[in-house]
């Protein structure tokens, strides 16, 4: 836990008064269940709190940033920013994935890379930060870590190429679309995945990304652009 405390201070200038909150935020249910006799707290309640404060801060930001955009557009953009995949990416950016405590089974099954776990971890950290430091510090952290990517347009006009590819290919009948991980590279906190997509056994595209889902979308985009062009 000392290494995590050092990371938080060095990168974000954060020092927790109540380190037990930090400990709880980084404890997955699988770890707590394996150490039931020790009555260790896990991070689900903090995740609940963090989710609420994240929704509030992002909603306020979008409301002030885009005064002329309708409610529907703001809701879609907020959903993209706070979705599981996005929050998992922020966890990796902060190197939080290095410090989460997992049960042995969860660790062996790749839990440290699982987007559900990493997204929940990010929210749990925000919950712990809120209890320890208050709303303004949480807001500053979110503005430091998340908002630069929002303002860079990373979450605008997100296209679901997997769905677009499926609709294009299945317009002439049922086909089997298969996504496979070709390779993984990089350290645990900055993984890069390469994924291929094939249709009825025929390779139609490849893509890379910081997560399997992002790599699948890139592969689908690559395939969609080629297949759509061939249909013209």
Curated annotation (Swiss-Prot):
- Going by the entry's taxonomy, the superkingdom of the source organism is recorded as Bacteria
EC annotation from Swiss-Prot or TrEMBL:
3.1.26.3
Residue span(s) of domain DRBM:
160-229
Pfam families with a match to the protein in the record: dsrm, Ribonucleas_3_3
- Gene3D superfamilies attached to this UniProt entry: 3.30.160.20, Ribonuclease III domain
The residue ranges of the RNase III domain are: 5-134
Q: Name one GO biological process term.
A: regulation of gene expression
Give UniProt keywords alphabetically.
Cytoplasm, Endonuclease, Hydrolase, Magnesium, Metal-binding, mRNA processing, Nuclease, RNA-binding, rRNA processing, rRNA-binding, tRNA processing
Gene Ontology cellular-component terms for this entry are: cytoplasm
Q: Does the keyword Metal-binding apply?
A: yes
- Return the HAMAP family for the record: RNase_III (MF_00104)
The protein here is known as Ribonuclease 3
Q: Which gene encodes it?
A: rnc
């Amino acid at each position: 836990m000392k290494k995590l405390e050092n990371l938080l201070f060095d990168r974000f200038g954060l020092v927790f008064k109540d380190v037990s909150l930090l400990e709880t935020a980084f404890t997955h249910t699988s770890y707590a269940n394996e150490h039931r006799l020790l009555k260790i707290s896990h991070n689900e309640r903090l995740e609940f709190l963090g989710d609420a404060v994240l929704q509030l801060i992002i909603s306020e930001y979008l409301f002030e940033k885009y005064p002329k955009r309708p409610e529907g557009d703001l809701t879609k953009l907020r959903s993209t920013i706070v979705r599981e995949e996005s929050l998992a990416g922020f966890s990796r950016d902060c190197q939080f994935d290095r410090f989460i405590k997992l049960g042995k089974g969860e660790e062996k099954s790749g839990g440290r890379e699982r987007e559900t776990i990493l997204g929940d971890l990010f929210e749990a950290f925000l919950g712990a930060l809120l209890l320890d430091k208050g709303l303004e510090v949480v807001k500053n952290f979110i503005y430091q870590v998340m908002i630069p990517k929002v303002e860079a347009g990373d979450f605008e006009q997100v296209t679901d190429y997997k769905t677009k590819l499926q609709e294009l290919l299945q317009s002439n009948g049922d086909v089997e679309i298969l996504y496979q991980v070709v390779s993984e590279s990089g350290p645990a906190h900055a993984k890069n995945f390469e994924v291929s997509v094939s249709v009825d056994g025929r390779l139609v595209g490849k893509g890379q990304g910081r997560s399997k889902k992002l790599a699948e979308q890139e592969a689908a985009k690559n395939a969609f652009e080629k297949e759509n062009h061939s249909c013209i």
